[in-house]
Each structure stands twice: as structure tokens, then as C-alpha cells.
Amino acid sequence: TTPLSSKLLFYIYILNGWQQIHDNNSGKALGTQLEYRPDNLNLINWNTYIGDESSSSAPDNRMRYFTDLYWVHNPDGVFSITSCVYAGNQKRKQGNELTNNYWWQANFIGRYSFNESLSLSGRVEYFSDANNVQISAINPNISGFSAFSGGLCLNVKIKKQALLRFDGRYFGAKDNLFIDKNNLPSKSALWLVSNMTVWF
């Protein structure tokens, strides 16, 4: 960690690989983080990742390049905003050539706090992965995955150690990426999810 100024911090990481604890190959990966706090209400963060993703389960994978940029505004206030964009490129060996396989995402989240225990958040998002690097469609006849989503989430804080969430989320796409309640291909899906998080 290196402080570049009173508002700017730089981090560098040596990693085993992409979101993994066990190293799948002999090479290491490199990550960087630049954190900028212009004032007490805003945080702007930029991350990068470069690493060799070849392994026994994905022998054609080569270098992966990834970057994301996110902004957090007024996280402890009555109304807060979080927004993020990211993009990646997975190099793959096909014959004697290396191909570029891109994916990207953008989202915007707003949260309104009624009091210390109750808040409502809304989210809109778009995700595109034309070459199935991160995700594949449930429908085996569809190649690539591109979809948008929007949702509302009610957050109920239970004392200081637990958070209960009720989340409704709609997904839509131009292709039949999803499966409906009749087990048929569909261009949309609706999720209703609840969960509880406990910390100590």
C-alpha cells in the first residue's frame, strides 16, 4: 500500500489467480487498486487484474485482463448511490491463434434509508458475455449471454448482528436465455429471494 496523497491510495497485489485460493498453475497474477476519496461523501475506486488462467479444467485459457471502476456516494446517509462498470478479456488458444473473448457489465444502485433499521434499494444492470467466459445460458441452443435486470430490495436490520433481505428482480433478454415455470425457453425471468446475513 502506498499513499500518493491525503486523498489517494495505491495498492498492489500478488495473487494465485482469478478468485481462487488454490493455485491452478505455476504463474502468479497481478492486481492493482487505486482508491480516491475527494471528500467525506464520495469514494471512487479503480481495480485491474492481469493473470494466466490456463489450468487442467480450462487448458485453452491464456492471459486474462480485467478492470473495474466504481463510485460510492453518501454510504451512511439517508440516500446513497453505488455505481459500477467493469470489462474483461480472456485470451483463448484456438488452433495456432489466440482469440479475444470479452465480457462487460454496468449497474446503478440507489438506496433510501427510512431509519436505522429499514431501507429500500433499487438496482438496474446490464451484463454481456458473448463468448461465455463468466456465464452460459441455461438453454443449450443459445451461444453467449446478454441480459438486463432491474429490482427492488427491502433491507431489515435486526439489532446490530443481522440483516434480513427481501429481493424481487426481473431479468430480460432478446434471446431465450431463461426457463419459465413450464420448463420452456423464455426471454425473461422473475426472481423472488429472501436471505439473512449474520455477523459477529
Residue ranges and their predicted role:
Residues 1-43, 47:
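Aromatic- and glycine-enriched pocket-lining scaffold segments that form the walls
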Residues 44-48, 52, 58-200:
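Outer-membrane beta-barrel pore domains
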Residues 19-21, 52-55:
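Short, small-residue-enriched loops and turns at beta-alpha junctions
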